[in-house]
Structures are given as C-alpha cells and as structure tokens.
C-alpha cells in the first residue's frame, strides 16, 4: 500500500495529513437474479389505483442495460408500457426513475442490487406505467423559441450562416441536451413552481440560443425571461447537474443566463458576420439547395 505523508502548518500548530491510496473495492457478484419492483398504472380512464408489481428477472438472459431488462419484463407481461427508441442515449425517450435517481434506461447499467425499483420520472402526470405526459415540459421548451432568429436574412433555408470556431465552442455542453427531462423532473424548484418556472432543460436551451453568434434577437429573448419565476426560481440545488445522463451542467448555464438577464454581462459580438456568405454572389450559388 502506498502511503504518503504530508506535513503542513495550521493555526493551532503542526498537523499531519495521512493519505492512503487503495485500489477500488471489487464489485460483489450477487448472481444473475434481480427482483424488479415496477410501478404499474392502467391510465387515468381506469378506476384502479397504481400498484407495484414484482418481476423476477434473470439478467443473464438479456443485455446489461436497464432498458434490456425492461424489454425482458415486457416479454413476461406484454401490458407493461414504456417509451423507447434509439437505445443509444440520443433520443431521450426512455427516461425513468431508477433506485430514486432519474436516468436514461438505455445507457444505465442494471444495478448490482437484488431489488431494483423502477418508477416513472417524478412530478409528471402518468399516462400508463412508465409513460408520462410531456406536454407541459415541451410547452416550456417551445416558449423559448429554440431556433435562430434573424432580423436580416435571405430566403429561408437556402443559405448557411457563418460562425467562427471560437463562437461555436461556446455552445459545447449546451446543444448536446436530448430533452429527456431527467433534470427538470429532479428539480424541486420545478416541482414547486412548475407552471411558471421553465426548468433546467428549457433554460439551458434558452442560454444556448442567446449566446449563438448567428442569432439576432438577443434583447427580446432576454426581455421574455425578465420575470420573477421563469429563470430566477432556480436556487442552485444542483439536482439537474447530478441527474443529467449526458453529463451536462444546466445549473452553470442558468447562472450565466441570470447574468445576461440582469445586465451584469453582455453578449459578445460575433467574430464574423454570420450573413457575409449570403451576400457573396459566388458563395450563394454554391450554398443554394438544389
């Protein structure tokens, strides 16, 4: 065992810090059997109360991801309902609450636990089993106008707008969001003020479009967010960053967005004119969509 002793002075005298570098403990093999406790609900038209149904699953007969186990459960009970699509963490469809944490089932390993609790993501109206109503979430997202707005533009969809590499790098960690709502449904502020607080995902995208050097509607976007609730209900609880399956940092984006809304910071001017290629006769002919 490697032991490193480091001496340092403190206000109350000289202390010693002991550092012990140990190899990580091996994961205990608990066998292939898992007991899945799954939330079941037949829908709002049913008069039955929600229940927890237990499934004994041999995970050695399916893949390693939670979604594989969910598909295995559906083979056992075809009435079990959930959303899925890409199976690669791109579409954001399979968001669930696993062992009390939000995640994407397709990129989350089956826990090394005998009992696995599987619920729909919280603070959403449940339509059936693990399927929730995403209408309110996407209404908030659409309200931030998630697209480039130009005051001076040519024929829509026929020309591309220029952007420097430095300006493009500002959006790294923002445009990777897949709108799975894991962050929003893990946020207590969104639970408490869901009707007016836009939530981490929508605010992350709002910041992404505001700092985009190709967008020309910055002032109106910021004006729309100057509200006591839309952005400033964020209390930096950090659940959004903790539960983001893509490893993004919505709380950081919201903090920077607040500086722009309050006027403490200004949007930087673009390194190049985004429409300069559209004004060039030679380039417009090359960029035109045939």
Please provide the spans of the model-predicted regions.
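Short, contiguous acidic and Ser/Thr-rich linear segments
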Residues: 51-64
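Ferredoxin-type iron-sulfur electron-transfer modules in oxidoreductases and energy-metabolism complexes
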Residues: 64-78, 119-290
């Amino acid at each position: 065992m490697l032991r490193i002793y480091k001496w340092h002075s403190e206000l109350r005298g000289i202390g010693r810090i002991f550092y012990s570098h140990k190899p990580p403990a091996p994961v205990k093999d608990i066998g292939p059997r898992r007991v899945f406790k799954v939330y079941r609900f037949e829908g709002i038209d049913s008069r039955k109360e929600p229940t927890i149904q237990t499934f004994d699953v041999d995970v050695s007969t399916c893949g390693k991801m939670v979604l594989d186990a969910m598909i295995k459960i559906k083979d056992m009970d075809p009435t079990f309902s959930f959303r899925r699509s890409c199976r690669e963490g791109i579409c954001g469809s399979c968001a669930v609450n696993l062992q009390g944490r939000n995640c994407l089932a397709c990129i989350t390993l089956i826990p090394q636990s005998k009992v696995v609790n599987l619920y729909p993501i919280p603070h959403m109206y449940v339509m059936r089993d693990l399927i929730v109503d995403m209408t309110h979430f996407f209404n908030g997202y659409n309200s931030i106008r998630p697209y480039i707005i130009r005051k001076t533009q040519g024929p829509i969809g026929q020309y591309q707008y220029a952007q420097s590499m430095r300006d493009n790098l500002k959006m790294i960690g923002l445009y990777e969001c897949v709108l799975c709502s894991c962050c929003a449904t893990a946020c207590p502020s969104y639970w408490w003020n869901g009707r007016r607080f836009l939530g981490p995902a929508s605010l992350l995208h709002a910041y992404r479009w505001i700092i985009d050097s190709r967008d020309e509607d910055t002032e109106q976007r910021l004006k729309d967010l100057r509200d006591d609730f839309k952005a400033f209900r964020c209390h930096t609880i950090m659940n959004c960053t903790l539960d983001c399956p893509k490893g993004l940092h919505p709380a950081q984006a919201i903090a920077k967005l607040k500086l722009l809304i309050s006027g403490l910071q200004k949007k930087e001017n673009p390194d190049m004119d985004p429409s300069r290629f559209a004004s060039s006769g030679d380039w417009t002919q090359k960029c035109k969509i045939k």
